[in-house]
Amino acid sequence: EVYKRQSRTVAKAAALLRENAGKVLAANALDLEAMDADSPMRDRLRLTAERIASIAADMESVAGLPSPQGETIAEWTRPNGMTLRKVRVPFGVVGMVCEARPNVTADIFALCVKTGNACVLKGGSDARHSNEAIAALLHEALGAEGIDENTFTLLPAGHEAVGALLSAVGYVDVVIPRGGAGLI
């Protein structure tokens, strides 16, 4: 069943993140090295073994949730006898723009895969190495379950990618900015 495969994919990604924490931490060290030591973004960017374990646990929690797809959230009958229902369905392609928070890469993957959506992520350039390392594991999890790896796409660093994402009308169904007012 599709819903079980989505849950397995998210759980597999969490397991891969735990198993490959060293690789992710090494990539994160490159990002931290390139960032100004006094930057207020530094703590948001920093990953530790504990933070990776927490990210994986959050992904496992999402994997364990029931699928919202197909759930009827409201139903009523009109005076003419016609029954109407509000049913949860995937958006389609979710675009996400975020700052230097590599944990968001895993979060958005888990939420999108679990809900049957594809995701295009534009992460902060400060987290480029971390995001690439995490994305490689997410792609591995997708492949392990026979899901097209393009279900999750990490855009290259740079402001041009944001413009391309925002102008992808007809290809991207919703864009969610996550960050401070300067991002929006």
Where are these predicted regions, by residue range?
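N-terminal Rossmann-like NAD(P)+-binding subdomain of aldehyde/semialdehyde dehydrogenases
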Residues: 1-86, 111
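Conserved small-residue-rich beta-alpha loop and adjacent elements
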Residues: 61-64, 68-145, 172
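Buried hydrophobic positions in well-ordered alpha/beta secondary-structure cores of metabolic enzymes
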Residues: 5-6, 59, 94, 116, ...
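Conserved NAD(P)+-binding/catalytic subdomain of aldehyde/semialdehyde dehydrogenases
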Residues: 93, 147-184
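Short alpha-helical
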Residues: 23, 103, 129, 160, ...
